[in-house]
Amino acid sequence: MSDSGFKVHSMELGPMENFVYLIEDIASHRCAVVDPAWEVGQIVARANQHNLDITDILLTHSHNDHINGIEDLLNHAHAEVHLLKPEYEFWAHELDKPSLHHGGDELTLGETTIKILHTPGHTPGSACYQLGNEIITGDTLFVFGCGRCDMSGGNPEHMFETLKDMKQRLPQDMLIHPGHNYSVKETCTLADQLEGNPFMHYEDAETFVNYRMHVHDRTRNEPYDAISKQQLKIANLL
């Protein structure tokens, strides 16, 4: 939630611990749903509870667990679907006139400005949505983790560059809203990530790729807790 002209409402839905987000523009009561999936009835009920008009759907990427409620939601709301052009091309799915974007584009939701970041790695056209001092990161960045890169469209080298860019460009007090509830807490700041996300500790692509592709999933279990740089060094993983 924010003290600005918007609020971010989170809902954990489905068997894969997905977070679905409702971005509320306070002045206009317009609402954008990020990654509608699983229980569309609950999403609509939450919007109605806050007297919100769902006018937009934002996709962080095209994996089924993040998009399987689009058609159902469009039956309930006259909404415009937004995603990055490279993700639409990777997805190869027919949508009725979606709005295709590029990294750096901005959306306007009432009086709220939403900046779209192109963050490839989990998929070629993965996107994060930045509004004020908060960012919705999909499966790019989790609390103390990052998205897999071994699925179709995944690329660990691209993920390394994406996280490196986020470390350099985003303010440390920015609040992270991830795509799944995989960790010991639902959200955190970028400063928390820099301190405790093992993927943020790597300075070169080769060691990052080795950890992401061959080590991480064998050595960590959910819920993810913080791992310091020193802990990685002691374990000879850095």
Regions from the language model: what does each represent?
Residues 2-3, 161-175, 179-238:
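Accessory terminal helices/loops
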Residues 2-52, 128-138:
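Conserved beta-strand hairpin/beta-sheet module of binuclear metal-dependent hydrolase folds
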Residues 33-34, 55-63, 82-85, 118-121, ...:
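Active-site neighborhood of phospho(di)ester-bond hydrolases with catalytic His/Asp-centered motifs
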Residues 89-93, 144-151:
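A short acidic, helix-capping loop that chelates divalent metal ions and anchors anionic groups
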Residues 17, 28-31, 38-115, 195-203:
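Active-site HxH/HxHxD metal-binding segment of metal-dependent hydrolases
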Residues 131, 136-142, 146-147, 156, ...:
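Internal catalytic or translocation cores that form aromatic/hydrophobic pockets or channels
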